[in-house]
């Protein structure tokens, strides 16, 4: 019997290496509660079902209400424009000083009245709870959940404080001038220093002692369906000043206001809302919350406490989704995956796994190449095996089960990212790569031939007629594979390292299940897998 045959014979004795073995050991890596799926899988989608009777009612009301309300909104905006001009005349777009008192005294009452009239003309009935804090009590309002462009009504009720807005919005005709009258903090998407400048500007205004107007911030940074509170951005909490949480509720039987990434468009929502007899909104001003000394030094901690406080009052859960999840949703759609496939709870995953946007986006490309052929944009065992160019075996099922955290028989993108970071990358060490190379290099000449490669894989996976020529050619540049080529391929494909360590775990379990005299018997495979000498082979397996 040659060396290949000896190694194959030993590998084939491992229980679980054959396809027909019944039962698999449970995953050896414990599930971390912090990686459990979020209570709300997708807060960026809204599906509103409108019955036939409601459609008829909206059509009949809309014949009268839609044109009248649209006309009134247009008239009010035109009436507000001169006051906005007076407020901002001869002022730079990015203010370095607050608008003078005489301008504010003339324009603020008029703009507040017209803004209230506009929302009233659109059919909004507003219920206000709590007391609005003064600039000295709370320089910053934090408003959540942010679910629609109609949330601007909170700004009106709060007395027209300053907003944080995109620089492009200030360039919009008519609306841009009205926005500038609020003395907004403008954010530029092309300026690399914009984030730092925005934080500094918020801090300067919040600590001005009432010289500047209060600032109203939507800390979620994007619109959701109000089913949860997503991660709060720390910008409003960095100054370390007291904030007043503001809750928004829309207690309507038919939701015509929610504006999410998947749902009705801006124009559709305007039409649907204008066709309602009225739209109810509740605005609750909660007690002012001052940061502790620890929270002043840790704005993320401060933001987390305020979010939990608001979520408790709203009786909804919190998740670690962010605006970056929306970007991943768009990327998933461009890769022909369902948009929701890109959701990973970016804030949690990036923090716990030390992954940045570019790293997760790269994993999405990899995931799409595997899952694009499957239904629903999820990886099944067949797609997993096809990607690895290996048959469905118990070793492969072990690895698949480790990735499949919720045991639903498929791997979603979130599970894929966690699996690579938690399972595969730690297993893909220099030592493991060396051990794997030694196992395949049966004749110990420093190269792996296709015969050696096929023989070991066929035996360890329990598939004697396995064709792995395609996988071998992907690794090899010539007729054999050097250690450097083997290492380069392993580093680019960490999934194979986990397959190998899973195989070693199964082999170790088998050794311990044998009688003591058999455990101490030397074998080709044990000598090659263990980096130590033959005499220490058994103890090394225990360490594994």
From Swiss-Prot:
Residues of the EF-hand domain:
391-426, 428-463
Catalysed conversion reaction: a 1-acyl-sn-glycero-3-phosphocholine + an acyl-CoA = a 1,2-diacyl-sn-glycero-3-phosphocholine + CoA; a 1-O-alkyl-sn-glycero-3-phosphocholine + acetyl-CoA = a 1-O-alkyl-2-acetyl-sn-glycero-3-phosphocholine + CoA; a 1-acyl-sn-glycero-3-phosphate + an acyl-CoA = a 1,2-diacyl-sn-glycero-3-phosphate + CoA; a 1-O-(1Z-alkenyl)-sn-glycero-3-phosphocholine + an acyl-CoA = a 1-O-(1Z-alkenyl)-2-acyl-sn-glycero-3-phosphocholine + CoA
Domain of life, per UniProt, equals Eukaryota
* Activity regulation comment: Acetyltransferase activity is increased following acute inflammatory stimulation by lipopolysaccharide (LPS). Acyltransferase activity is unchanged.
Q: Where is this motif: EGTC motif?
A: 220-223
**InterPro entries, sorted:** EF-hand-dom_pair, EF_Hand_1_Ca_BS, EF_hand_dom, LPCAT1-like, Plipid/glycerol_acylTrfase
Q: Tell me the pathway.
A: Lipid metabolism; phospholipid metabolism
Q: What residues bind Ca(2+) 2, as annotated?
A: 441, 443, 445, 447, 452
Acyltransferase in keyword set: yes
GO MF, one annotated term: calcium ion binding
Q: Which residues lie on this side of the membrane: Cytoplasmic?
A: 1-58
Q: Which residues cross the membrane?
A: 59-79
Q: Which family does the similarity line name?
A: Belongs to the 1-acyl-sn-glycerol-3-phosphate acyltransferase family.
Q: What is known of its domains?
A: The HXXXXD motif is essential for acyltransferase activity.
What's this protein's function? Exhibits both acyltransferase and acetyltransferase activities. Activity is calcium-dependent. Catalyzes the conversion of lysophosphatidylcholine (1-acyl-sn-glycero-3-phosphocholine or LPC) into phosphatidylcholine (1,2-diacyl-sn-glycero-3-phosphocholine or PC). Catalyzes the conversion 1-acyl-sn-glycerol-3-phosphate (lysophosphatidic acid or LPA) into 1,2-diacyl-sn-glycerol-3-phosphate (phosphatidic acid or PA) by incorporating an acyl moiety at the sn-2 position of the glycerol backbone.
Query: Would you tell me the protein name for this molecule?
Result: Lysophosphatidylcholine acyltransferase 2
Species this chain originates from: Mus musculus
